[in-house]
Amino acid sequence: MNLFRKKVKEWVYSFSTEDHYAEYNSNDQFNMGMRSQGASHHDVEAHAQSANDNILSMEDDIDLDSMDGTPSEGVSEVLLAWRHIDTWTSEYNPDLNATLSDPCTANDIKHAEEDLEVVLPKALKASYRIHDGQEDLESMTGTSGLIYGLQLMTLDEIVAMTQRWRSVADKLNKQATMSKHSSVGVSNGSSMGSTASIGSSSQQQREKPRNKFKLPYIPEQKSIPPETVLPLYAHAMWIPVLTDNAGNHIGIDLSPARLGKHGQVIMFGRDFDTKYVVAENWGDFLLSFANDLEAGNWLLVDDSDDYLAGEGELVFRDKKSNGPIQDYLEVLKKRSWNKYQEQLRTNQETMQSGEPTLTSTRTHKKTSSFELDDDFDHTTTTTEHNGNEFIESSVPETNSDIPQIVKKEELDETAEETKEESNELDVKTEEIAPESTQIIEETPETKEEEVSEQPEEAVAEVTVDANIEEPEQQVEEQEVLLENEVTDSVNNADANTEAVPEVEEKKTEIETETPAEPIEEEEESTNVEAPQVEEEEDSTTAEPAETVSKSKKKKNKKKNKKKNKANQDDNVNELSHDFETVQL
């Protein structure tokens, strides 16, 4: 008798309720969605109004306040998307519109959440309060899935498919656990003995056929963008919503990775070792599909000869490029990849704009310090100073005012060379025996020119040797070297001026004793060289000429010393000027 009453109540319940997923139970709490095995539960106001094809009245029937506790992102996008989808399907493909089911009730959604032990996002709840997926696809030939061939599953199918993928995830977890235990058992067996190892291996062989999964191995799992989806083949918190009836799905991710977002829409399945994030929420995904329909990115393909089969299957084709028909899953993959690449470019641009430029860092080094940097390439530049060229080494774009540092040994060598050359000139002038006053008067000029040219040549040698790569020395060494050079040059000048009073006294004595005699002219040019003067010395043998030559020799020596002193003073002035510029 009780069984008969139960059947009658179930029959009455089926006619009096709008629930699709919820079933009759004699317990009133069960029918009101108060199951004990669910996750977090909230009081739900059951809606008893009849389904209506008008979306406006359906929006009023949806009670969003009953969906507290879940993110509300995407709800308005869902309502807007379904307006366009219903309008388009009723106009261009009525048979496809006829496959859309009536809305499910809040009690259905609550029972599904309790069975899955999850809390669905508000956007998905609002979508199923408008249409509970598609039905009667097999009975209606010439139709396909709503989303370019992808079928929108009913709430009952979603629960069943989720349970299947959870069983797959459980098997994979068991395999991973067994592999860990087997590796531990092998390591322990090596220490325990051969008998225990043989027994464990035989037990593993018996359990292996029972726990073996269909796939021989699981490839490496990835995601686009990286670290947005967990790198797993299957997960218990991935809720499939669309299916291609071949093991691939578009669903809701309720357990994202570190960079993911709760409720994001992902692609996963048997053909997707790389998971793709196609939208941030279900409302954005539905709205993108509606935009494709409004943009004309669609075709209706009818391969059947049956004229009563309907308008055909809905497929994707890009209207702008007028390209071929494309699989919508591949289109979504491409869009996800392009969005990821665009995000990378944006991040690179922001990073480049935030980093200081190379020019600014080099300018900062120039203004803050006076040190040479070994990391920069060194070049040489020439500047004019008092008629002489000084070759300076400078760093491009930075230390262009720093002169080249010269070693102390090089300066000492050049000073010794100039001193030796001046001594040689003095010796040559002593050996000269002039025969005429013209020679005596012209030779000092030639010697003056030679002596004046010697410091310039020495300076040129210094500047040439300055090209040696010595950029690492500090400016302080240069200051010390320049001071030493100045002191050496001053000491040489003082030594040359000591013999001037004695020469003047001897000159006056000789001039009073011996009168000067006329001397014949032998050369017309002023640039008299040393070998020619030596030949003239052989031709002068007279004794009076010897006395005259001694007086003139002293006179010439005096003039040469004066010229040398003047030239050395000029060099000292130039070096002191350089020293002042370096100090500045």
Swiss-Prot record:
Residues covered by region (Disordered): 176-210, 346-584
Compositionally skewed regions (Basic and acidic residues) per UniProt: 406-431, 575-584
GO terms under cellular component: cellular bud neck; incipient cellular bud site; mating projection tip
SUPFAM superfamilies membership: SMI1/KNR4-like
Coiled coil regions in record: none
Residue spans of biased composition, Low complexity class: 182-204
Similarity section: Belongs to the KNR4/SMI1 family.
Gene3D superfamilies: SMI1/KNR4-like
GO biological process, one term: regulation of mitotic cell cycle
InterPro entries in the record: Knr4/Smi1, Knr4/Smi1-like_dom, Knr4/Smi1-like_sf, KNR4/SMI1_regulator
Ranges of compositional bias, category Acidic residues: 447-459, 467-486, 511-540
Basic residues bias spans: 550-565
Protein name per its UniProtKB record: KNR4/SMI1 homolog
SMART domains according to UniProt: SMI1_KNR4
Pfam family, one: SMI1_KNR4
Composition bias type Polar residues, residue spans: 346-361
